[in-house]
């Protein structure tokens, strides 16, 4: 675990095999923030931004390669088919072939950049005796994380009055494999509210988040610990 003190609080980075858990603690104890990054990399770049530490996951090379391959494939299809002639007949315009290819490739490149998104980054912020805020960012691969958070972040706040409990629930997935996931029981809701629906932390990290969340939400039950073998 890597921990560092800032003027606004303490940031801890727990690097796991399949993900990275970032914990931001407010120096006054007003809130704590848990962010799960769906990549494991000890060479993160940390950028101090608006009272928090933004973690730059680095360039998603596999996503960029996918965008390039899609554009190359579309270019070959345009050259070997009568696609450009069909466009000329449809819109009754005559444009030089080179300009046609340039325009179409530009539009297709823009479309792939918009549609091919980076991995989801999920954050749970727990405010002292107030509630919890869930956020999810699935931004563009060419944008830095702080830009994606600004333009593509989806945020939901659940007040303390609506939260009945925070639990670690047991479930089954394909192949009858048992999984555990953090969820909030919300008043007047027929389903559990998953805290990390896309990125599933390990059971030990879930216990850590569970115990801290109950402390911040004024739950007095005994903290969870790893069962003895």
Swiss-Prot record:
The UniProt record lists the keyword Cell wall biogenesis/degradation: no
Domain of life: Eukaryota
Pfam family of the protein (one): PIG-H
InterPro entries named in the record: GPI-GlcNAc_Trfase_PIG-H_dom, PIG-H
Record-level GO BP terms: fungal-type cell wall organization; GPI anchor biosynthetic process
Keywords: Glycosyltransferase, GPI-anchor biosynthesis, Membrane, Transferase, Transmembrane, Transmembrane helix
Transmembrane feature ranges: 59-79, 101-121
GO cellular component: endoplasmic reticulum membrane; glycosylphosphatidylinositol-N-acetylglucosaminyltransferase (GPI-GnT) complex; membrane
GO MF: phosphatidylinositol N-acetylglucosaminyltransferase activity
Subcellular location: Membrane
Subunit details: Component of the phosphatidylinositol N-acetylglucosaminyltransferase (GPI-GlcNAc transferase) complex composed of at least GPI1, GPI2, GPI3, GPI15, GPI19 and ERI1.
Protein name, per record: Phosphatidylinositol N-acetylglucosaminyltransferase subunit GPI15
Organism from which the protein derives: Saccharomyces cerevisiae (strain ATCC 204508 / S288c)
